[in-house]
Protein backbone atom coordinates (compact mmCIF):
# COMPACT_ATOMS: atom_id res chain seq x y z
CA UNK A 1 0.00 0.00 0.00
CA UNK A 2 1.42 3.37 -1.01
CA UNK A 3 1.80 6.16 1.57
CA UNK A 4 -0.32 9.31 1.69
CA UNK A 5 1.63 12.19 0.15
CA UNK A 6 0.83 15.84 0.78
CA UNK A 7 2.45 19.26 0.54
CA UNK A 8 3.94 21.14 3.50
CA UNK A 9 6.03 24.18 2.62
CA UNK A 10 8.32 23.82 5.64
CA UNK A 11 9.13 20.14 5.00
CA UNK A 12 8.83 18.64 1.52
CA UNK A 13 8.04 14.93 1.31
CA UNK A 14 10.43 12.99 -0.90
CA UNK A 15 11.40 9.48 -1.95
CA UNK A 16 10.75 6.74 -4.51
CA UNK A 17 6.98 6.97 -4.14
CA UNK A 18 7.11 10.66 -5.04
CA UNK A 19 9.30 9.88 -8.05
CA UNK A 20 6.79 7.24 -9.19
CA UNK A 21 3.94 9.70 -8.67
CA UNK A 22 5.71 12.33 -10.77
CA UNK A 23 6.34 9.82 -13.55
CA UNK A 24 2.67 8.79 -13.60
CA UNK A 25 1.44 12.39 -13.61
CA UNK A 26 3.74 13.24 -16.50
CA UNK A 27 2.56 10.18 -18.45
CA UNK A 28 -1.05 11.32 -17.99
CA UNK A 29 -0.32 14.80 -19.32
CA UNK A 30 0.00 16.70 -16.01
CA UNK A 31 3.39 18.42 -15.68
CA UNK A 32 4.89 17.79 -12.20
CA UNK A 33 8.02 19.82 -12.94
CA UNK A 34 11.39 18.15 -12.52
CA UNK A 35 11.07 14.43 -11.74
CA UNK A 36 13.29 14.55 -8.68
CA UNK A 37 11.37 12.66 -5.98
CA UNK A 38 10.45 15.89 -4.14
CA UNK A 39 6.79 16.80 -3.60
CA UNK A 40 6.99 20.53 -4.20
CA UNK A 41 4.44 23.14 -5.37
CA UNK A 42 4.69 22.14 -9.04
CA UNK A 43 3.94 18.49 -8.27
CA UNK A 44 1.06 19.48 -5.98
CA UNK A 45 -0.42 21.61 -8.80
CA UNK A 46 -0.18 18.60 -11.14
CA UNK A 47 -2.01 16.47 -8.56
CA UNK A 48 -4.77 19.09 -8.29
CA UNK A 49 -5.13 19.17 -12.08
CA UNK A 50 -5.26 15.37 -12.24
CA UNK A 51 -7.90 15.18 -9.51
CA UNK A 52 -10.09 17.67 -11.38
CA UNK A 53 -9.63 15.77 -14.65
CA UNK A 54 -10.80 12.41 -13.30
CA UNK A 55 -13.53 13.75 -11.04
CA UNK A 56 -12.26 12.81 -7.58
CA UNK A 57 -11.87 15.00 -4.49
CA UNK A 58 -9.70 18.01 -5.33
CA UNK A 59 -7.43 18.59 -2.32
CA UNK A 60 -3.86 18.04 -3.56
CA UNK A 61 -3.43 15.07 -1.19
CA UNK A 62 -2.37 11.75 -2.69
CA UNK A 63 -4.30 9.28 -0.56
CA UNK A 64 -5.94 5.92 -1.41
CA UNK A 65 -8.53 7.48 -3.75
CA UNK A 66 -5.95 9.44 -5.75
CA UNK A 67 -3.49 6.54 -5.85
CA UNK A 68 -6.30 4.34 -7.17
CA UNK A 69 -7.04 6.82 -9.95
CA UNK A 70 -3.33 7.30 -10.72
CA UNK A 71 -2.84 3.56 -11.14
CA UNK A 72 -6.15 2.93 -12.94
CA UNK A 73 -5.76 1.80 -16.50
CA UNK A 74 -7.07 4.48 -18.81
CA UNK A 75 -8.17 2.82 -22.01
CA UNK A 76 -8.45 4.45 -25.42
CA UNK A 77 -10.81 2.63 -27.81
CA UNK A 78 -9.89 5.07 -30.55
CA UNK A 79 -8.21 8.40 -31.02
CA UNK A 80 -10.25 11.08 -29.31
CA UNK A 81 -12.20 8.80 -26.94
CA UNK A 82 -10.95 7.76 -23.49
CA UNK A 83 -12.54 5.48 -20.89
CA UNK A 84 -11.68 5.43 -17.20
CA UNK A 85 -13.17 3.84 -14.10
CA UNK A 86 -12.66 5.54 -10.74
CA UNK A 87 -14.03 5.50 -7.21
CA UNK A 88 -15.18 8.54 -5.29
CA UNK A 89 -16.26 7.99 -1.72
CA UNK A 90 -18.37 4.81 -1.71
CA UNK A 91 -19.40 5.04 -5.36
CA UNK A 92 -17.87 3.58 -8.52
CA UNK A 93 -17.96 5.81 -11.59
CA UNK A 94 -17.40 5.10 -15.28
CA UNK A 95 -16.40 7.90 -17.63
CA UNK A 96 -16.17 8.39 -21.37
CA UNK A 97 -14.34 11.54 -22.42
CA UNK A 98 -14.60 12.37 -26.13
CA UNK A 99 -13.12 15.05 -28.36
CA UNK A 100 -15.93 16.80 -30.22
CA UNK A 101 -13.91 17.27 -33.38
CA UNK A 102 -13.11 13.54 -33.58
CA UNK A 103 -16.12 11.72 -32.13
CA UNK A 104 -19.74 11.62 -33.28
CA UNK A 105 -22.61 10.75 -30.95
CA UNK A 106 -25.48 8.86 -32.61
CA UNK A 107 -28.96 7.98 -31.37
CA UNK A 108 -29.33 4.19 -31.27
CA UNK A 109 -32.51 2.14 -31.36
CA UNK A 110 -35.73 1.71 -33.29
CA UNK A 111 -39.23 3.15 -32.76
CA UNK A 112 -41.55 1.15 -30.47
CA UNK A 113 -38.94 -1.51 -29.76
CA UNK A 114 -37.02 -2.38 -26.59
CA UNK A 115 -33.49 -3.74 -27.09
CA UNK A 116 -30.39 -4.43 -25.06
CA UNK A 117 -27.79 -1.70 -25.35
CA UNK A 118 -25.19 -4.29 -26.38
CA UNK A 119 -27.33 -5.15 -29.42
CA UNK A 120 -27.84 -1.53 -30.41
CA UNK A 121 -24.17 -0.62 -29.93
CA UNK A 122 -22.65 -3.09 -32.38
CA UNK A 123 -20.13 -1.29 -34.57
CA UNK A 124 -19.64 1.55 -32.07
CA UNK A 125 -16.57 2.32 -29.97
CA UNK A 126 -18.69 2.91 -26.88
CA UNK A 127 -22.29 3.51 -25.80
CA UNK A 128 -24.40 4.61 -22.85
CA UNK A 129 -28.05 4.27 -21.89
CA UNK A 130 -30.24 7.18 -22.90
CA UNK A 131 -33.61 8.81 -22.27
CA UNK A 132 -36.22 7.97 -19.66
CA UNK A 133 -39.00 5.90 -21.19
CA UNK A 134 -42.53 4.60 -20.68
CA UNK A 135 -43.46 1.25 -22.20
CA UNK A 136 -41.53 1.41 -25.51
CA UNK A 137 -41.45 5.21 -25.99
CA UNK A 138 -38.68 7.57 -24.83
CA UNK A 139 -40.04 10.46 -22.76
CA UNK A 140 -39.19 13.96 -23.92
CA UNK A 141 -38.20 15.21 -27.34
CA UNK A 142 -36.14 12.94 -29.58
CA UNK A 143 -35.24 13.78 -33.16
CA UNK A 144 -33.10 11.54 -35.35
CA UNK A 145 -32.39 12.84 -38.83
CA UNK A 146 -35.43 15.09 -38.44
CA UNK A 147 -37.86 12.31 -37.42
CA UNK A 148 -39.39 11.89 -33.96
CA UNK A 149 -40.67 8.83 -32.08
CA UNK A 150 -41.17 9.98 -28.51
CA UNK A 151 -43.77 10.98 -25.95
CA UNK A 152 -43.08 14.68 -25.38
CA UNK A 153 -42.87 15.99 -21.83
CA UNK A 154 -42.96 19.68 -20.81
CA UNK A 155 -40.55 19.24 -17.88
CA UNK A 156 -37.61 17.85 -19.85
CA UNK A 157 -34.61 19.72 -21.22
CA UNK A 158 -33.26 18.94 -24.70
CA UNK A 159 -29.73 18.82 -26.14
CA UNK A 160 -28.94 19.24 -29.84
CA UNK A 161 -26.39 16.46 -30.52
CA UNK A 162 -25.01 18.18 -33.64
CA UNK A 163 -24.41 21.67 -32.27
CA UNK A 164 -24.37 20.79 -28.55
CA UNK A 165 -26.87 23.43 -27.56
CA UNK A 166 -29.03 22.95 -24.47
CA UNK A 167 -32.69 23.96 -24.80
CA UNK A 168 -34.80 24.82 -21.79
CA UNK A 169 -37.97 22.95 -20.87
CA UNK A 170 -40.99 23.21 -23.12
CA UNK A 171 -39.44 23.02 -26.60
CA UNK A 172 -41.52 20.74 -28.82
CA UNK A 173 -40.21 18.69 -31.73
CA UNK A 174 -41.90 21.07 -34.18
CA UNK A 175 -40.28 24.12 -32.56
CA UNK A 176 -36.86 22.46 -32.59
CA UNK A 177 -37.24 21.46 -36.24
CA UNK A 178 -38.00 25.08 -37.05
CA UNK A 179 -34.79 25.99 -35.20
CA UNK A 180 -32.89 23.67 -37.54
CA UNK A 181 -32.34 20.85 -35.04
CA UNK A 182 -32.10 17.41 -36.67
CA UNK A 183 -30.74 15.18 -33.87
CA UNK A 184 -31.59 15.69 -30.22
CA UNK A 185 -32.54 13.91 -27.00
CA UNK A 186 -34.18 15.00 -23.75
CA UNK A 187 -33.52 14.34 -20.10
CA UNK A 188 -33.85 15.69 -16.60
CA UNK A 189 -32.81 17.27 -14.41
CA UNK A 190 -30.56 19.91 -15.90
CA UNK A 191 -27.27 19.55 -14.01
CA UNK A 192 -25.11 22.35 -15.41
CA UNK A 193 -24.60 25.30 -15.52
CA UNK A 194 -27.11 25.27 -12.63
CA UNK A 195 -28.51 22.15 -11.00
CA UNK A 196 -32.29 21.72 -10.95
CA UNK A 197 -34.33 19.27 -8.91
CA UNK A 198 -35.83 16.34 -10.82
CA UNK A 199 -39.60 16.37 -11.28
CA UNK A 200 -39.97 13.03 -9.48
CA UNK A 201 -39.14 12.35 -5.83
CA UNK A 202 -37.91 8.90 -6.86
CA UNK A 203 -34.97 10.58 -8.64
CA UNK A 204 -33.83 12.70 -5.70
CA UNK A 205 -32.02 10.04 -3.71
CA UNK A 206 -28.85 8.05 -4.20
CA UNK A 207 -28.82 5.36 -6.87
CA UNK A 208 -27.41 4.24 -10.21
CA UNK A 209 -27.16 7.34 -12.38
CA UNK A 210 -26.32 8.34 -15.95
CA UNK A 211 -25.55 11.84 -17.25
CA UNK A 212 -24.21 13.60 -20.32
CA UNK A 213 -21.99 16.68 -20.07
CA UNK A 214 -20.06 18.83 -22.53
CA UNK A 215 -18.04 21.98 -23.06
CA UNK A 216 -16.64 23.75 -26.12
CA UNK A 217 -14.31 20.90 -27.04
CA UNK A 218 -15.26 17.75 -25.12
CA UNK A 219 -18.16 15.43 -24.37
CA UNK A 220 -18.43 13.58 -21.03
CA UNK A 221 -20.62 10.52 -20.47
CA UNK A 222 -20.78 9.52 -16.80
CA UNK A 223 -22.38 6.45 -15.21
CA UNK A 224 -22.47 5.67 -11.48
CA UNK A 225 -23.17 2.19 -10.11
CA UNK A 226 -25.53 1.87 -7.14
CA UNK A 227 -27.82 -0.34 -5.07
CA UNK A 228 -24.99 -2.69 -4.13
CA UNK A 229 -22.46 -3.26 -1.37
CA UNK A 230 -19.70 -2.35 -3.84
CA UNK A 231 -21.18 1.01 -4.84
CA UNK A 232 -23.62 3.22 -2.94
CA UNK A 233 -24.79 5.17 -5.97
CA UNK A 234 -24.85 8.91 -6.61
CA UNK A 235 -27.29 11.79 -6.35
CA UNK A 236 -27.78 14.08 -9.32
CA UNK A 237 -26.05 16.98 -7.49
CA UNK A 238 -23.04 14.67 -6.99
CA UNK A 239 -23.08 13.81 -10.70
CA UNK A 240 -23.16 17.54 -11.45
CA UNK A 241 -20.17 18.15 -9.18
CA UNK A 242 -18.09 15.42 -10.82
CA UNK A 243 -18.90 16.75 -14.30
CA UNK A 244 -18.13 20.32 -13.21
CA UNK A 245 -14.72 19.24 -11.93
CA UNK A 246 -14.08 17.42 -15.20
CA UNK A 247 -14.61 20.71 -17.01
CA UNK A 248 -18.18 20.38 -18.31
CA UNK A 249 -20.09 23.63 -18.67
CA UNK A 250 -23.42 21.97 -19.54
CA UNK A 251 -24.87 18.66 -18.33
CA UNK A 252 -28.14 16.78 -18.38
CA UNK A 253 -29.41 13.81 -16.37
CA UNK A 254 -30.42 10.68 -18.28
CA UNK A 255 -32.26 7.50 -17.28
CA UNK A 256 -30.58 5.67 -14.41
CA UNK A 257 -31.62 2.94 -12.01
CA UNK A 258 -31.47 -0.50 -13.58
CA UNK A 259 -31.17 1.12 -17.01
CA UNK A 260 -27.84 2.87 -16.26
CA UNK A 261 -25.25 1.20 -18.46
CA UNK A 262 -21.99 1.90 -20.27
CA UNK A 263 -20.43 -0.20 -23.01
CA UNK A 264 -16.82 0.16 -24.03
CA UNK A 265 -15.08 -1.90 -26.68
CA UNK A 266 -17.99 -4.31 -27.02
CA UNK A 267 -18.63 -5.12 -23.36
CA UNK A 268 -20.56 -3.66 -20.44
CA UNK A 269 -18.02 -2.06 -18.10
CA UNK A 270 -20.31 -1.07 -15.23
CA UNK A 271 -22.51 -3.31 -13.09
CA UNK A 272 -26.22 -2.76 -13.88
CA UNK A 273 -28.21 -2.99 -10.66
CA UNK A 274 -30.57 -5.65 -12.07
CA UNK A 275 -27.59 -7.95 -12.53
CA UNK A 276 -28.20 -7.98 -16.27
CA UNK A 277 -28.92 -5.61 -19.15
CA UNK A 278 -32.32 -3.96 -19.05
CA UNK A 279 -33.91 -3.59 -22.52
CA UNK A 280 -34.46 0.06 -23.47
CA UNK A 281 -35.84 1.96 -26.49
CA UNK A 282 -32.72 3.98 -27.25
CA UNK A 283 -29.14 4.71 -26.29
CA UNK A 284 -26.23 6.87 -27.41
CA UNK A 285 -23.36 5.48 -29.49
CA UNK A 286 -19.87 6.98 -29.79
CA UNK A 287 -17.84 6.51 -32.97
CA UNK A 288 -15.07 8.17 -34.95
CA UNK A 289 -16.17 10.85 -37.40
State what each model feature region is.
Residues 38-44:
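Phosphopantetheine-attachment site and its flanking helix in carrier
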